[in-house]
Amino acid sequence: MQEIVIPLKEKSYKVFLGELPEIKLKQKALIISDSIVSGLHLSYLLERLKALEVRVCVIESGEKYKNFHSLERILNNAFEMQLNRHSLMIALGGGVISDMVGFASSIYFRGIDFINIPTTLLAQVDASVGGKTGINTPYGKNLIGSFHQPKAVYIDLSFLKTLEKREFQAGVAEIIKMAVCFDKNLVERLETKDLKDCLEEVVFQSVNIKAQVVVQDEKERNIRAGLNYGHTFGHAIEKETDYERFLHGEAIAIGMCMANDLALSLGMLTLKEYERIENLLKKFDLIFHYKIIDLQKFYERLFLDKKSENKTIKFILPKGIGAFEATSHIPKETILKVLEKWH
């Protein structure tokens, strides 16, 4: 089993990559999963979990259930189980479950521990590591949340065997995001290798990138913003389509394409670099047709992004391959001209 240590000022923890080991706990544990994952993997976890008391809370599957109602269900289960400050929650699922359980554990009794056991590629390489938690609101995605680091993360690649191809590819989008902004060697590996032949190495490399970024910038003041490449546009797309048409990773892939268009227009990408990223997305079937219905309304949605400040939109744009730049004060006319391609 491989380990990555994430040493933070207030709390350090480990990410374990390998077969899920026996987890022995001396306290109560509330497992939260969704209606699909629980049917596939809950028994596998229960076979390996030893705790003072175990209870399971199952939430409906899907991004549209990442809301106040689901959060309340998790907290009600915790109260009914009489969890205390020494108890913990366990997130078994994808990014939606990871985000919600992290947030629920951060506000229950002003904060208790939680463990992440991600079952999707997207959650394994991104959502489960770093402590960003939250829920969606009618106004936008992840607008209510907190920074709350897990006690541990267990990444078992055998969970991925039950993923549909579409879900798997959505996770690859997040790997490409990290590669383009932080690691040109990973870009080259994705371009030249068959991912099936090097999946464990790529997952480890991606988690390691995320870990290093989080250690440098836990609360997203500077370098961690690079992990939001594609997300300003992507979140607007998810909201506009009511979280139903695209998976999160798919929306981010479209968002990266829009960000690339903007970067190209600003001279931050050469045409060759632009085409490299586009071809990489094509390789993993991550090029999608999307039509913006109302250009002005879509533009206004961009201001609801958490990175926006002083009435300006902050974009994370690739600066060549392996680097990025956070940029604001781009004229509205420039943004709308780029988005015309999608209108």
From Swiss-Prot:
GO terms for cellular component: cytoplasm. Its EC number is 4.2.3.4. It comes from Helicobacter pylori (strain G27). Pfam families: DHQ_synthase, DHQS_C. Belongs to the sugar phosphate cyclases superfamily. Dehydroquinate synthase family. Pathway: Metabolic intermediate biosynthesis; chorismate biosynthesis; chorismate from D-erythrose 4-phosphate and phosphoenolpyruvate: step 2/7. Its cofactor is Co(2+); Zn(2+); NAD(+). Keywords: Amino-acid biosynthesis, Aromatic amino acid biosynthesis, Cobalt, Cytoplasm, Lyase, Metal-binding, NAD, Nucleotide-binding, Zinc. GO terms for biological process: amino acid biosynthetic process; aromatic amino acid family biosynthetic process; chorismate biosynthetic process. HAMAP family: DHQ_synthase. The keyword Nucleotide-binding applies. It catalyses: 7-phospho-2-dehydro-3-deoxy-D-arabino-heptonate = 3-dehydroquinate + phosphate. Catalyzes the conversion of 3-deoxy-D-arabino-heptulosonate 7-phosphate (DAHP) to dehydroquinate (DHQ). The gene is aroB. SUPFAM superfamilies: Dehydroquinate synthase-like. This is 3-dehydroquinate synthase. Its main location: cytoplasm. Binds 1 divalent metal cation per subunit. Can use either Co(2+) or Zn(2+). It comes from the Bacteria.
